[in-house]
Each structure stands twice: as structure tokens, then as C-alpha cells.
Amino acid sequence: MRIVLFCENKYAIDILNPIQEHVTKQHLPHEILWYIHKPKIDSFPYADQVKWTNSIQEVYDFKPEAIYVPGNIVPYYLPGVKIQIFHGYAAEKKDHWIIRRYFDTYFTQGPYFTSHFEALAKRYGDFEVLETGWPKQDWIKENLHKYDADREKLLRESGKETLIL
């Protein structure tokens, strides 16, 4: 499968990188192209490690089968299934529940958001909703106890029960 990881804003890099890592780690037969929006992202930290472009034309020519977007818009004329990845907890934002008709699928981060978007999917009838979790948070779960020994050492050395760093 040809996949585009679409980064219009710098924060999108950390949200999409777990997808790149998963494909690489699992040796999956997918080809990934990152789109980096140059006016908003002046440096791409993985530039020497992954295939990437600043050109929408190159994205189009790549003929993606799926485009992952942690943002609100993606050019409608690009080929492939367009997937919006929700990545925060800002349900109070006025535009959070607006359906802009750019996306075929919405990946939601939890039951609260999933239920709201499923109701919208029934109303609009032209997109799907899938609860996937929040890939940017996966690191926390995977490394939850990685620093326990360091924590205990700091507490012992400081003579404190808790520390706020």
C-alpha cells in the first residue's frame, strides 16, 4: 500500500511518526511518503531517514492509496482514502465537530469522540468512524515504568516522597 503522512503543521510530525515506526518495525510492505508543508514546517527531523516531499504534485504522482491527516483539511483532488486522525482532547473547540467533507474515515481517540462522530456519520452517511486510540500517547503506555529506577533514585537522593520536575 502507498501511504502519505500529511503534515501541514509541525505538531503533525509527532502524531504521524508512530505509523512510520510501526510500518518500519513490522517490516510491512507499505511505501510511505511524508508531505511536509514548507511554509509552516521549516525543518523536518526525519529528513535523512524517510522519503518525503514539499510538493503536492509529488504526492499526487505517488498515487497514494491512503492519506493520514492530523488536521482539518487535505486537498480533495489527491487520490486515495483520506483519513483524519484525531489527536487531542479539545472537544470544546467550536470547529471540532464540523464535518468538512474532505475525509472518508475518521480515526478517533476514545469512546466519547467515537460516539459523537458515529452519530455524525449516520447523519451525513458518507464517511466511516474507527476508534483507534491516540498513537502519540502509545509511547507513554509502552514506557510507563521505564524510568521507575531513575525516579526512585532521585527520591532517595533528595529525601523527598515526591518531586515535580
Model-assigned labels for residue ranges:
Residues 158-165:
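Conserved donor-binding/catalytic core segment of Leloir-type glycosyltransferases
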Residues 4-148, 154-155:
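Active-site and donor-binding regions of nucleotide-sugar-utilizing enzymes
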